[in-house]
Amino acid sequence: SLKDPFSYSLLILGGTLLATFIAALLFEVFHYFSPRILQNFFREIAFFIQSIPDVIMIFAIQLFSIWIFKKTGLLILDPVALGEDHVYLLPIIALSILPIFMLFQMIDLSVSEEQQKMYVEYAYAKGLSKREIFFKHILRNTTITIFSNLQYLLWFIISSLLILERLLNMDGLFSFINGLDIKFIAVGL
């Protein structure tokens, strides 16, 4: 049945989107209120992590999970799905890491653009605090930009989900690709 793999993939996708939004917003808040040196360092780290291919990131997380298990005997993240078992935490973490930094960079760019606008200077002149200006004005005005770029983030996550399902032996939405006859694919095209 297609319903179970679809709901499993949808759960992973939803968890990834939720984790991505929460983490990217928290990173931006931390970044915004940090000293200038730390802000530059954080931007460089985000750029570096975003340049790592998703396949390598997935393997690194799997290896890290196995390394922790070998050292401590504690299985924090189940590295693969076997049989009818489903893994949830590892796919969500693996799918979230790169989109978190992509979304962080989108938010940061949008916040930088908003800071240049006149209403921010006016708010400072009125005596509003940096915190009030950020949460009440800047962050609220950046949501339009964030949601207009959401489609790129979603396509990136879906394409990574295809790779992840294969690497982690997940029985998700894209599992139908494994057992299809080439004639069936040709007819579908």
Where do the protein language model's features map onto the residues?
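Transmembrane alpha-helix signature in integral membrane proteins
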Residues: L2-F30, I146-Y152
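Transmembrane-helix boundary motif in ABC transporter permease subunits
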Residues: T16-F47, F59, L161
